[in-house]
Design a protein with these regions (language model features):
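Rossmann-fold cofactor-recognition segment
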Residues: 66-69, 206
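Residue-level recognition of beta-strand->loop/alpha-helix junctions
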Residues: 46-49, 71, 124, 172, ...
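Gly/Ser-rich helix-loop-strand patches that form or flank binding pockets
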Residues: 1-4, 79-131, 223-264
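Charged docking surfaces used in two-component/phosphorelay signaling
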Residues: 52, 71-77, 209-216
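Short, well-ordered secondary-structure micro-motifs
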Residues: 104, 132-133, 154-155, 179-183, ...
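A short, acidic, amphipathic alpha-helical segment used as a generic capping/interface helix at domain edges
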Residues: 192, 212-222
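Short, aromatic/basic amphipathic alpha-helical patches
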Residues: 54-63, 109, 185, 189-196
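Small/aliphatic-rich secondary-structure junction motif
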Residues: 2-59, 137-181, 195-202
Length: 264
């Protein structure tokens, strides 16, 4: 049974938003998509930026959200994680330019997934229109699971977000043919996970995909028009069904054209 209470038990939480985008490239639409976390007592956003601009400070202040600017001319993994620690952040948001330095960008993503003890939301600089339902990127979530320890932590994190979640599509990816017994056990596990979500007032459905894990997760996101993907971070041991490669979370975070939340 998944335990609840992944987020720190404190009245106020802080978000660290790391970006190398210039002022004209940074999407306010995307920021609006993240703002539903206000309902979870996230009261402050610390912007870790390579460029000194503060055009959003007043707008966020009008929404009763504190904000500050921290300058870092490189945005390397250790610098981002150090800033998150110094700011006592509960969640890291990373918004990197997809057009410049892809190899460097992917390397930073990989190191962050490996080393972070905090959940990281890779926004992937999406400019997709946010649904006008108040839930932003939490309106429709694809949750990829293999029931490993990391996946169960990701589910626990999502349960903490149940107040702002819309629809959840629970996805498991298999490789090769399963026996009738294995398929029955898989369906039972999916049903158990779905029940946990339903018991927490989360509208959830479950699905089985077959193929390369990262590719099928991205396919599921397209199939269900997801606004965000949630996946557990890399594990030393593979999941019970040996379905996830250690690099799946990294591949999804690098290749997706929508936000990806990786829970360590």
């Amino acid at each position: 049974m998944t335990k609840k209470g992944y987020l720190p038990s404190m009245e106020a939480r802080k978000l660290l938003y790391a970006t190398d985008l210039k002022e004209k490239s940074l999407s306010f639409n995307l920021l609006k998509g993240i703002l539903p976390v206000r309902e979870l007592d996230f009261y402050e956003i610390a912007f870790l930026q390579t460029t000194p601009y503060d055009s959003w400070i007043k707008g966020l202040s009008d929404l009763n959200i504190k904000s500050k600017i921290i300058l870092d001319d490189q945005l390397l993994p250790h610098g981002i994680l150090k800033a998150a620690k110094n700011e006592e952040a509960s969640l890291i948001v990373v918004n990197f330019d997809r057009e410049e330095g892809k190899t460097s960008r992917n390397s930073v993503i990989r190191q962050l997934i490996k080393k972070s003890s905090l959940p990281i939301l890779f926004t992937n600089n999406t400019n997709k229109e946010i649904k006008p339902d108040g839930k932003g990127i939490f309106a429709c979530v694809v949750f990829a699971t293999d029931w490993s320890y990391k996946s169960e932590k990701a589910l626990a994190f999502l349960l903490d977000f149940k107040k702002i979640l819309g629809e959840m599509e629970i996805v498991n990816v298999i490789k090769g043919k399963l026996t009738i017994k294995e398929m029955r056990e898989l369906k039972n596990r999916l049903a158990e996970t779905r029940k946990i979500c339903l018991d927490n007032k989360i509208d959830a459905e479950s699905h089985i995909y077959a193929g390369k894990t990262s590719e099928e997760i991205l396919t599921a996101a397209k199939d269900y028009k997801a606004a965000m993907i949630v996946i557990g971070g890399e594990s030393e041991k593979k999941g019970l069904n040996r379905l996830f490669k250690k690099s799946s979370s990294w591949e999804v975070a690098c290749e997706a054209d929508l936000p990806v939340l990786v829970v360590p």
